[in-house]
């Protein structure tokens, strides 16, 4: 029993699996996901900017200013 415990503690992370590390990432998948997220954020940002630009140029109401307020 003591030998089994020492064998488990000798492995990285204390797991019985041996060489499999749970903190290794598939960087290609992470990169693709990041690029997709960045592209979507860029497109949404452009849509927000363009929608505000076209809406603000429409019917502007000018307020009349009295000379007393100046």
Curated annotation (Swiss-Prot):
<comment type="function">
    <text>May be involved in forming the receptor site for cardiac glycoside binding or may modulate the transport function of the sodium ATPase.</text>
</comment>
<dbReference type="GO" id="GO:0010248">
    <property type="term" value="P:establishment or maintenance of transmembrane electrochemical gradient"/>
</dbReference>
<dbReference type="GO" id="GO:0017080">
    <property type="term" value="F:sodium channel regulator activity"/>
</dbReference>
<dbReference type="GO" id="GO:0016020">
    <property type="term" value="C:membrane"/>
</dbReference>
<feature type="region of interest" description="Disordered">
    <location>
        <begin position="1"/>
        <end position="20"/>
    </location>
</feature>
<keyword id="KW-0406">Ion transport</keyword>
<comment type="similarity">
    <text>Belongs to the FXYD family.</text>
</comment>
<dbReference type="GO" id="GO:0008285">
    <property type="term" value="P:negative regulation of cell population proliferation"/>
</dbReference>
<keyword id="KW-0472">Membrane</keyword>
<keyword id="KW-0812">Transmembrane</keyword>
<dbReference type="GO" id="GO:0006883">
    <property type="term" value="P:intracellular sodium ion homeostasis"/>
</dbReference>
<keyword id="KW-0740">Sodium/potassium transport</keyword>
<dbReference type="GO" id="GO:0016323">
    <property type="term" value="C:basolateral plasma membrane"/>
</dbReference>
<dbReference type="GO" id="GO:0071475">
    <property type="term" value="P:cellular hyperosmotic salinity response"/>
</dbReference>
<keyword id="KW-1133">Transmembrane helix</keyword>
<dbReference type="GO" id="GO:1902600">
    <property type="term" value="P:proton transmembrane transport"/>
</dbReference>
<keyword id="KW-0739">Sodium transport</keyword>
<dbReference type="GO" id="GO:0036376">
    <property type="term" value="P:sodium ion export across plasma membrane"/>
</dbReference>
<keyword id="KW-0630">Potassium</keyword>
<dbReference type="InterPro" id="IPR000272">
    <property type="entry name" value="Ion-transport_regulator_FXYD"/>
</dbReference>
<dbReference type="Pfam" id="PF02038">
    <property type="entry name" value="ATP1G1_PLM_MAT8"/>
</dbReference>
<protein>
    <recommendedName>
        <fullName>Sodium/potassium-transporting ATPase subunit gamma</fullName>
    </recommendedName>
</protein>
<comment type="subunit">
    <text>Regulatory subunit of the sodium/potassium-transporting ATPase which is composed of a catalytic alpha subunit, an auxiliary non-catalytic beta subunit and an additional regulatory subunit.</text>
</comment>
<keyword id="KW-0633">Potassium transport</keyword>
<dbReference type="GO" id="GO:0043269">
    <property type="term" value="P:regulation of monoatomic ion transport"/>
</dbReference>
<dbReference type="GO" id="GO:0005890">
    <property type="term" value="C:sodium:potassium-exchanging ATPase complex"/>
</dbReference>
<dbReference type="InterPro" id="IPR047282">
    <property type="entry name" value="ATNG"/>
</dbReference>
<keyword id="KW-0813">Transport</keyword>
<dbReference type="GO" id="GO:1990573">
    <property type="term" value="P:potassium ion import across plasma membrane"/>
</dbReference>
<dbReference type="InterPro" id="IPR047297">
    <property type="entry name" value="FXYD_motif"/>
</dbReference>
<feature type="transmembrane region" description="Helical">
    <location>
        <begin position="33"/>
        <end position="50"/>
    </location>
</feature>
<keyword id="KW-0915">Sodium</keyword>
<dbReference type="GO" id="GO:0030007">
    <property type="term" value="P:intracellular potassium ion homeostasis"/>
</dbReference>
């Amino acid at each position: 029993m003591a030998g089994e415990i020492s064998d488990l503690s000798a492995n990285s992370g204390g797991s019985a699996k041996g060489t499999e590390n749970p903190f290794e990432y598939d960087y290609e998948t992470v990169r693709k996901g990041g690029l997709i997220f960045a592209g979507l954020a860029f497109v949404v940002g452009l849509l927000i900017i363009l929608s505000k630009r076209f809406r603000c140029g429409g019917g502007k109401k000018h307020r009349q200013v009295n000379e007393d307020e100046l």
